[in-house]
Amino acid sequence: MPRLTETPLQLLEPRTGTAAVPTQFGVPWPRGAMPQSPQFDLVDASGSTPVDTWVAARWPDGSVKWTGHAGCAPAGDARLVAADGKEGTAATTAPRTGVVVEVSEQADGSIDVDTGVLRVVIAPHDGAPLRHLEVDGRLVGQDGRLIASSAASPGSGASRREHRVRTTAAGIERRGEQQVVVRLEGHHEVAGERVFPFVLRLYATAGSRRLRAVHSLVWDADPESLFLTSLGLRMEVPLRSAPHDRHVRLAGSEGGFLTEAVRGLTGLRRDPGAEVREAQIAGAATPPVESWAPEVSRRLHLIPTWNDWTLRQLSAHGYTLAKRTAGDRPWIPAASGTRSQGYAYLGDLEGGIGMGLRDFWKLVPTQLDITGAATEHGAVTTWLHAPSAEPMDLRFYH
């Protein structure tokens, strides 16, 4: 069979926008068509993009059967091309220039990953292993951790016990020029028992601000005595701007978003000014307060600040969204819909954190929480099992 040096690729899912995004994919090769594994580039109309390549399987004759690839994929269809057009030559193994992922292991056991725009410090022995995230040198997130709770009985009124989630090991599972995978291992501790061994993989890609997390958990507890009541990933967000320059985004259904500020300046009885309103709606910095209409600037302290938002997808057919000004204040219904796309963002003029859960509405009961938005330390939580839902009951049904 003739040797192949390229193959066409087609996106299976439509993608909005034109920016390249991190991706991992596999390519099958006919028997004998790829004797060795070269470096590859993704090539489209805008140019070529390097990707990491590894052999996932071989044919009995030793030729490559499957290759795995990771990097930033272009927004449209592309071709996977051997870096020099000739697979298996010495030239294909030479280092390539451009943005690469840098990773280092520190003396204290922490792991420092830098994609060129995103820096992540992972401290496996901390209670919050995602110590901090920086974008372009600015701190945007800190103290990221898994959280969970359970009950000893299945009733909705049963007392809930907070789990202590411990990370016991961390290491670099795959190190490439374009992508690094960090593997965290640990377990939960509850009521004196060690349960739920888990693996959390973090994928960081060169030139990207995105950090992908894949969580795997083994259920090894007694289903007759342990009922999971919540399981989620939380990231704290430092907030430095004034409340009217802090912003919240929550994804609804069919591409819609709830877009609000912590202290809203639109729809008021008094108008702060068109420039102020337009800036806040756009998520940009508002003009100095002194330039606002005095009827608003003098009464700014009377405009409520919203502290918490919750989006609950408790069935595949509908979600509800509510918000409140403080923990001792009532929840105010804000929106509802069918199938949320499962994304939440909290940030200010210095940056913020957006978290999304793939197949959000298919994994019900799920939930997104934004908390502490009116304080100096907010948080975004993605719930794999919503705390507002009934406890997870894994007992045999008869």
Which functions belong to the PLM regions below?
Residues P2-G17, V214-D220:
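Short beta-strand elements of extracellular/lumenal beta-sandwich folds
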Residues S37, L42-W66, Y397:
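Solvent-exposed beta-strand/loop surfaces of large extracellular or lumenal domains
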Residues F40, D77-R79, V117, H215:
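Conserved structural-core and active-site-/substrate-pathway-adjacent residues in large, well-folded domains
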Residues H69, Q106-H398:
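Beta-strand/loop-rich accessory regions of lumenal/periplasmic or secreted enzymes
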Residues E87-T115:
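Terminal connector regions
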